[in-house]
Amino acid sequence: MHLTDYLTRLPKADLHCHLIGTVRAGTFADLARRAGLDLPAPPETIWRDINSLPPDPALYRHTRIPVPSGAGTDEPEVSYSLFRASEWVMAALGGADDITRITYEAFEDAHRSATRHVELHIDDVPPQLASLGFHGLVDACVDGIKLAERDFGMTGRLIASIDRSRDAEEALAFVRKVADRPNDYLAGIGLVNLELAGPPERFADAYRLAGAAGLRRTAHSSEHAPVAENTRTCLDLLGCDRIDHGYYVLEDDALVARCRDEGVPFTVISTTSRRSWRPWRRASIGAMAAAGLNVILASDDPGMFPTSLAGEYRIAAETIGLSAARLREMSLAGIEAAWLPPAEKAAARARFAREIAALDAEFPPG
């Protein structure tokens, strides 16, 4: 068996995946046409040309791993940012059936990567679906997950995402709404959007409430802000169980050592809508792995980049240089860091062990 086949079939958990970012170009085209969206280009062209422009290069002048300041080699003539594309998807959603559809399709696509468990970040309900409400949105997502459980034998959970461009009171109100109606499929909260738009300490009260309500906690950190301190804040003040991204933790040796010793899970993605940053991302992930950090590959916005979790594993092997043995460890680490109750996690752990043993019988470990 070729290594590519091995990595495609390796069982995986995707712990960092945004529902809106999973939407297929064809699905967006359907939704946009029905909604009558006034778009600057055909939906398929927009998806092909998603390319977010990096922030001010001066912010990254002194980072340990150099951040590219010029254009990438594959940038389109006209670029559409990931965030603008996400806004168009949100505006095109017409009701609960659309949400169930995109959730199911997210799992269907993940299944092709041998992904056995997915945790989806979801945003608050868009204005045109105010009558559905946040909990109606959650129910529609759960309907999609249950269909995927039936059809693909997968498991899934949801992460309610706080938009860090909002103020502290809005975040607190959102978490109250999340906590007011517990749902077994809604496992925790996250902190998303451009890191420079909102420091983690702004959301301390919201995270404290989430913890008191028994919700798990993660946050995008040390991704756009070239500092490790945000990750320390997420761990110590926000009480995060995991860190999403975390590349700039490499700026602080003491924090790297602490995270290594504590086994803090970092969900990392080598592909990004900032095409010029992809080499830097891959170098950072390689350095994090070399430092002994608990890095777990994820897909982030696979429909829009585009990528897949199997593709991320192949990049890790072929471009970053991680061994099959290390990627097996990441596969298992993913299920250990999943927000599943003990019985479900034990079942998933046993399934991963069985599937990996069967693969290793075909492909000698290396």
Residue ranges of each PLM-predicted region?
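Metal-cofactor-binding active-site regions of metalloenzymes
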Residues: 1-215, 223-242, 248-366
